[in-house]
């Protein structure tokens, strides 16, 4: 039956389909391997092999230890040795906590130890065979048996769990490159914190002691706490973070006890860095209001002053304090020897504001031709926190317009909203008036 295609047209169409079938070729293994590697970095295969080796090592460790992922975190029942555990419990008797108050030495016999069992009695005892005489000191807590009250175990100092939880275990993810507009301040901090830990011989050769305390002060939102987080990420020393309001306790003497235990725990470390945030909560100038409401806060501050530079040496402990009201701090807390260096975090300049904008815009999906210097000129007397809010609002404008990329117009609208619209909420002029 004739159709709309002629014989010539039908021949040419068949020839085209044959040529297309000839042009299509199946992918071989080499082409598939190239496609799999497309978009990967030069070290992707090495990283994969390292990840596989790490997973295999973890599997071996879990198999040897008998611990598998479970809700209870216990080993499987097939690996339990209940008979050996019962025998160990029968051989090892429970110990009682006591305190060694005095060591009595004599030439005729071995030293004796005077222990005080709380709310019970005092005994003169000797050591068990498993304890060396050099492990026991006066004033330390020990574990004694209930029969002969022999000392079987030296115990660490008793520290409040709230103080132990102040220690930062995981390092923050903030580095010095994430802090903009604070180049001079970072250098001053590194001279106090990093140089004495990495190059102590420089100070020994000069015969001086490195500064041990730094006060960070400036308007709210200028990067004081952010710099402290960057210091915690950089140093390998133990980092303890304390908020000033945590030292204000209900009962008399609790705040001073927490400060003592805090420095006792810091002295047990090889090197320690303590950061007091919002120190004006406990470090205010002393005055008498006639009612005695601030007496407990003042006692806490006096204990802090004593620990910073009192009769006992501080040791290898660096102290950072941050506040936005330095005019309210007590002069005894501010003197050199306790806080040797005062670092002011002022408002960022034009280059600092542009750097802060680039830091926050680096994590965003933005256009490439944004003029950050122009945006920085439109944000006079703005802090780093306000500039970060500008970047967040620019992203909100892009989301509202259903776009995946923020434009320069979004940043301009965000500046009008944050810098100019929220000017009445800014505390920077009030801070500059007080200080």
Curated annotation (Swiss-Prot):
Keyword Nucleus set for record: yes
The entry's keywords: ATP-binding, Cytoplasm, Nucleotide-binding, Nucleus, Proteasome
UniProt cross-references to Pfam families, sorted A to Z: AAA, AAA_lid_3, PRS7_OB
Residues at which ATP binds: 218-225
GO terms, molecular function: ATP binding; ATP hydrolysis activity; proteasome-activating activity
Region (Disordered): 1-24
Sequence ranges of Basic and acidic residues compositional bias: 1-23
Subcellular location: Cytoplasm; Nucleus
Function per UniProt: The 26S proteasome is involved in the ATP-dependent degradation of ubiquitinated proteins. The regulatory (or ATPase) complex confers ATP dependency and substrate specificity to the 26S complex.
Similarity field: Belongs to the AAA ATPase family.
Name of protein: 26S proteasome regulatory subunit 7
Source organism of the structure: Caenorhabditis elegans
């Amino acid at each position: 039956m004739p159709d709309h295609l002629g014989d010539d047209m039908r021949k040419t169409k068949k020839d085209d389909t044959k040529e297309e079938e000839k042009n299509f070729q199946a992918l071989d293994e080499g082409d598939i391997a190239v496609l799999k590697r497309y978009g990967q970095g030069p070290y992707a295969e090495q990283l994969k092999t390292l990840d596989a080796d790490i997973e295999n090592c973890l599997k071996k460790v879990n198999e040897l230890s008998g611990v598998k992922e479970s809700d209870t975190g216990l080993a499987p029942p097939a690996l339990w040795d209940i008979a050996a555990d019962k025998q160990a419990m029968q051989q090892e008797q429970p110990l009682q906590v006591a305190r060694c108050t005095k060591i009595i030495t004599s030439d005729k016999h071995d030293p004796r130890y005077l222990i005080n069992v709380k709310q019970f009695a005092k005994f003169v005892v000797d050591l068990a065979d498993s304890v060396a005489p050099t492990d026991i000191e006066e004033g330390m807590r020990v574990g004694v048996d209930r029969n002969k009250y022999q000392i079987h175990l030296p115990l660490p100092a008793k520290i409040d769990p709230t103080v132990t939880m102040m220690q930062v275990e995981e390092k923050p993810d903030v580095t010095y490159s994430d802090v903009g507009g604070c180049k001079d301040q970072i250098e001053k901090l590194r001279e106090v914190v990093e140089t004495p830990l990495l190059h102590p011989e420089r100070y020994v050769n000069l015969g001086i002691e490195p500064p041990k305390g730094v006060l960070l002060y400036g308007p709210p939102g200028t990067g004081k706490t952010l710099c402290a987080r960057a210091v915690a990420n950089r140093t390998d020393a133990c980092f303890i973070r304390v908020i000033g309001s945590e030292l204000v306790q209900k009962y008399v003497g609790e705040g001073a006890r927490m400060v003592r235990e805090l420095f006792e725990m810091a002295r047990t470390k090889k090197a320690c860095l303590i950061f007091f945030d919002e120190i004006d909560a406990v470090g205010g100038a002393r005055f008498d209001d006639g009612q005695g409401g601030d007496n407990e806060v003042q006692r806490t501050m006096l204990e802090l002053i004593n620990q910073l530079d009192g009769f006992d040496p501080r040791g290898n402990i660096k102290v950072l304090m941050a506040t936005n009201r330095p005019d309210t701090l007590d002069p005894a807390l501010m003197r050199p020897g306790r806080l040797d260096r005062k670092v002011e975090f002022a408002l960022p300049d034009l280059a600092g504001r542009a750097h802060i904008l680039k830091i926050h815009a680096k994590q965003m999906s933005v256009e490439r031709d944004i003029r950050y210097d122009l945006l920085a000129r439109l944000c006079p007397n703005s802090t780093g926190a306000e500039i970060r809010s500008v970047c967040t609002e620019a992203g909100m404008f892009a989301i509202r317009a259903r776009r995946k990329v923020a434009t320069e117009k979004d940043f301009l609208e965000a500046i009008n909203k944050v810098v100019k619209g929220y000017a009445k909420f800014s505390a920077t002029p009030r801070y500059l008036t007080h200080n």
